[in-house]
Amino acid sequence: MKAQFSQGTLKRLSMMRESEGSQSRSKRPFIVLGTLVGIFFASTAVLAVILGLKSKAAQKNVDNELCVTPYCVKAANYLIESLDETVEPCEDFYHFVCGAWIKNSRIPDDADSINTFSTLRTQLDYNVVDILTQPPSNDTAEPTALDNARILYNSCVNEQNIEDEGTDTILSIVNNELGGWPILEGSSWDNSTFNLFDLLLKLRKYNNDIIFGIGTSVDEKNSQQYDLVIGQSDIGLGQRQYYSNESKITVAYREFIRDLAKELSDNTSMVDTDVNDIFAFEKEIAKHYWTTEERRGRPNATIRTTVGSLTDLLKTSFDFSTYLRSAYAWSGVTLDDSDVVTVHELEYLNNVSSIIDQTSARLLQNYIVWRFMMHRVDNMPKRFRSIKENFQHIFRGTTSDVSRKIICGNFVNGNMGFAVSALYIKKYFDDNARIQSSEMIGNIRKSFSDMIEKSSWMDEASRKKAIEKAEAIDEKIGYPDYLAGDNMTQLETQYADYKFTSSYINNVLKLIQIKAKEEFQILRKTVDRKAWGFTAPTVVNAFYAPSKNQISIFWFSYLSSSIFLFIAFPAGILQMPFFDRDAPKYLNYGGIGVVVGHEITHGFDNSGRQFDKDGNRIPWWTKETVQEFNERKTCIVDQYSNFTVPNINMKANGNQTQGEDIADNGGLRESFFAYQKWAQANPNADKKLPGLSKYTPEQMFFINYAHTWCSKMTDSYAMNRVLSDVHSLGQFRVIGPTSNFVEFDRVFKCQPGQGNSRVKKCIVW
């Protein structure tokens, strides 16, 4: 563009030219020089004006391209503070996005980790406490269920009353109902009245599954009804691997038992011997305990039988058939011989039954009552809780205790979540989130169907059924509708028995018996495929359940369920950095969008693929398609099994995490393609974030995705995650999917073979 001079400048130049003739010849060189200098400075000044105008115009254009809403400013801030731009994104995208966040974040003393989810959960925790501590509203009538939730909370935080009540109630149950705890009585304990069957039955009424687990679940072969389930229960340290070698954790576990026994009794004559025997017995049981990997890796190892045929199947001295009948009869449910029973971990049941047959009455009584007391310590005075907290510090790697009000808020929310949610959604939830989330789910579902349509490894019949299943997925967003209305009849009915007093220990004992009865009584109910389910909106997670083919988005949650075929997104997850109604869509699709895709993909992972669109576990893929799927799945398993966990030098377990890894990879691809389509239909609608304008919208999609997985954890917690969690660590949830995605390579101009770009991409969906 040519320089444009003002009229004043042009006039001055003309006057200089007219005066040249009247000057003497001797002064002409100086005049010419002066004129040239003047022209130079004038031109420079004009050029400065021009450049200034251009700069202002350019700045105005930049400003028009920026999103400067409060949310965008906040989002820009958290992302800028997270990025480490000294790291090459094509070499290590996780540390490129999370490097500064990791450096500057500090794990709270009372926590074993910090990440995006824990930050949201912390906010939820305080919101719940606020709801439970605020006085009832004078303007509107609040449900009685919420009043009872507040009573339960107040009994939990009333430390003085807990101290005054002491341990009399718990010890009365132990001594008068359960037959005593031998470790407290030394050699005076009388074993003549010991009855394993009666002991386990009494504890099951307190919602304790010890050694053997029983309960109710959706029938995998007929998703319209419930059936009975039998299998292994849990073990004290959670996973078999902890018992393999002596460690600071096994030492701390024995100290937990020993210190509790000594605090409860002055008779310490046999404490050390009993503690060692209890641990040795549990260690023996643990040898037969199925790990998370083994349970997920043997989906067809379950056996379907009936109550009448159960004894013939198990052939153990422990009468499981009578045990089931007695437990359900306590809740008012009479079992028939024809009632279906799904048996899990059959080898465990047989092997542990044989161990029990060779174990003394004293040891069985000691172990079983210990497992009851292990949980009831939480409801006892502070000096007893401190014993468990000392163990937790070693097991989790923490250095201080969670505040009492947060513990109590979580306890009430975990047991009366829908009552808490009734007020939570009115106070904290934006209904626009439901509308926008529903639209995104539709777009991402369509994206997944398109991916199925283009999959070359599926035969036509399997592909058609897969698309039908994807289109049939039911979705739950935010909260059930009845919580938002004025009619609280359904809520009041749900919590009709939840009436409490000022006695915390008695409230807890009543509550766990209610929960036990509810699980048994649901057996005779019909499965409501459209119902919200059992998870309240006040959680931070999302869910997919195969036997309902349903997805749910709540305000606070991100899990997966193998019971119902639906996906759930509770209210708690629909906020920054996952979602905001004012956010550019590349942030929402990179956040909650990937979560949506993740949950949809669960319907087609190694477990979900075995359920049809109606939620029944039946073969609906051809053998050829199953073989093709397994080859692609193996690629994912091998890839993730080669990841090494920093600091603890452990390999990730790709077999254990395969379902979640498949969902992570598919979810990222689905959401990205859905965002691409949205962006094509809405050109230039997404503005850039201040301070991050050098990144394209597609790059920002991946950056926000990775940011949701920034995490930091103690070594103890990292080991626990590797041993037991079906989810990969955050670092691998970023590196794995992005390194398999050619669109990531294109967006960041990566070359296959670089650190964050695999040459051989592992692609299932």
Summary of predicted features, one role per range:
Residues 3-42, 252:
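Helix-loop boundary elements of multi-pass alpha-helical membrane proteins
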Residues 20-24, 77-84, 106-108, 188:
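Asp/Glu-centered strand-loop micro-motifs enriched in Gly/Pro and often flanked by an aromatic residue
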Residues 28-65:
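Alpha-helical transmembrane segments in eukaryotic/viral proteins
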Residues 51-53, 121, 278, 284, ...:
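Intrinsically disordered, low-complexity linker/terminal regions across diverse proteins
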Residues 55, 59-81:
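Short, Gly/Pro- and small/polar-rich lid/capping loops
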Residues 67, 71-72, 88-91, 96-168:
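Active-site-surrounding "flap" and adjacent substrate/cofactor-binding loops of secreted or lumenal enzymes
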Residues 82-104, 242-262, 457-460, 658, ...:
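Hydrophobic/aromatic-rich, well-ordered segments within soluble, folded domains that form packed cores
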Residues 127-443, 480-483, 492-519:
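Noncatalytic, helix-rich "gating/capping" subdomain that lines the substrate-entry/channel surface
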